[in-house]
């Protein structure tokens, strides 16, 4: 009995002074392990008679339970201490300046495209899309390009090795290809724009091998140049947010429109005229190529370069800067992620 009390006091004294869970586990093994002190006392049962064995066994089990409870209580204290220490170490010092949050922004081409689409949506234009890789028919033949037209030459068009109908496929040189596909697969009336990337073999301050276009088509019965001029004039004034802007429609030539015109603008009377887009009435041959009766339906088409409009509106001097990835330039000309253009609030914030 005295030995059991001695073991209990020894366990209490040692466990009380424990400073960490690792040391506590070592004392658990020392007292309750396979070769521990309490286990050693249990081995004495074999030398006792039945009555003594019963009484001594009961005392040993109580000793074991007390030591287990002492260890459990100490473990809870140590675990709480370790948790508090960890929380204190991980505590955020709110007085330290926060790191700058890196947030993406909207590229001026993307912003300009959204603004252009927003304006045309006010006229009820929908959006049509088409493939970047095209065949000769959709890119040239259906649009009334002659076989010897300069645009078909290698120095103007990117041709691919793959062929279709014994003619090489190509990267589309305009989004007019989308108009052809839409007219072939649908029935008039039409009123849509076709935004997308286009490709031409050219590179300087005002040209890049890849650029963005938006082409539009309106087709119905009794459509005329008056409708074209109204849409273009209203669109230009809305996009540049300037009701006093001057426009002039200058006669021109495009294989797929007749009559054709190029549109020039100037913000003030003393400014030079700037060419911004081409347009015209859809050529009867184009309608014939897509199976539409030109005696019943007429339409007008127009095409503009997104980069050109972005340069004019945001005062960007060199077209190549759009694609150089200069972070300083992008930071200067970028737009906020939530700068969503709308006519009511003003297109560009």
UniProtKB/Swiss-Prot annotation:
Tetramer of two alpha and two beta subunits. Its cofactor is Mg(2+). It is found in: Cytoplasm. Pfam families: Phe_tRNA-synt_N (PF02912), tRNA-synt_2d (PF01409). Belongs to the class-II aminoacyl-tRNA synthetase family. Phe-tRNA synthetase alpha subunit type 1 subfamily. Binds 2 magnesium ions per tetramer. It catalyses: tRNA(Phe) + L-phenylalanine + ATP = L-phenylalanyl-tRNA(Phe) + AMP + diphosphate + H(+). Mg(2+) binds at residue 258. It comes from the Bacteria. GO terms for molecular function: ATP binding; magnesium ion binding; phenylalanine-tRNA ligase activity; tRNA binding. It comes from Rickettsia peacockii (strain Rustic). InterPro entries: aa-tRNA-synth_II, aa-tRNA-synth_II/BPL/LPL, Phe-tRNA-synth_IIc_asu, Phe-tRNA_ligase_II_N, Phe_tRNA_ligase_alpha1_bac, Phenylalanyl-tRNA_Synthase, tRNA-bd_arm. GO terms for biological process: phenylalanyl-tRNA aminoacylation. Its EC number is 6.1.1.20. This is Phenylalanine--tRNA ligase alpha subunit. Its main location: cytoplasm. Keywords: Aminoacyl-tRNA synthetase, ATP-binding, Cytoplasm, Ligase, Magnesium, Metal-binding, Nucleotide-binding, Protein biosynthesis. GO terms for cellular component: cytoplasm.
């Amino acid at each position: 009995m005295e030995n059991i009390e001695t073991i209990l006091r020894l366990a209490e004294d040692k466990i009380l002074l424990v400073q960490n869970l690792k040391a506590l586990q070592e004392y658990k093994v020392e007292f309750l392990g396979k070769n521990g002190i309490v286990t050693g006392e249990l081995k004495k049962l074999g030398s006792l008679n039945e009555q003594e064995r019963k009484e001594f066994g009961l005392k040993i089990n109580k000793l074991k339970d007390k030591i287990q409870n002492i260890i459990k209580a100490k473990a809870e204290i140590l675990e709480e201490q370790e948790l508090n220490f960890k929380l204190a170490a991980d505590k955020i010092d709110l007085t330290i300046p926060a790191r700058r949050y890196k947030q993406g922004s909207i590229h001026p081409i993307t912003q300009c495209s959204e603004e252009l689409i927003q304006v045309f949506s006010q006229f009820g234009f929908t959006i049509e899309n088409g493939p970047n890789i095209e065949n000769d028919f959709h890119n040239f033949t259906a649009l009334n390009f002659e076989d010897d037209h300069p645009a078909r030459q290698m120095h103007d068009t990117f041709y691919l090795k793959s062929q279709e109908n014994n003619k090489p496929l190509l990267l589309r040189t305009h989004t007019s290809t989308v108009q052809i596909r839409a007219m072939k697969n649908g029935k008039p009336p039409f009123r849509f724009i076709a935004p997308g990337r286009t490709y031409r073999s050219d590179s300087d301050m005002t040209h890049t091998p890849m650029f963005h276009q938006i082409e539009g088509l309106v087709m119905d019965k009794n459509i005329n140049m008056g409708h074209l001029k109204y849409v273009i004039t209203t669109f230009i004034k809305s996009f540049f947010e300037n009701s006093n802007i001057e426009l002039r429609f200058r006669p021109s030539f495009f294989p797929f429109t007749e009559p054709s015109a190029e549109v020039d603008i100037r913000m003030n009377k003393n400014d030079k005229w700037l060419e911004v887009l081409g347009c015209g009435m859809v050529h009867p041959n184009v309608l014939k190529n897509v199976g539409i009766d030109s005696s019943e339906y007429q339409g007008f088409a127009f095409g503009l370069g997104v980069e050109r409009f972005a340069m004019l509106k945001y005062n960007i001097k060199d077209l190549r800067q759009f694609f150089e990835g200069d972070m300083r330039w992008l930071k200067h000309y970028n737009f906020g992620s939530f700068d969503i253009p709308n006519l009511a609030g003003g297109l560009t914030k």
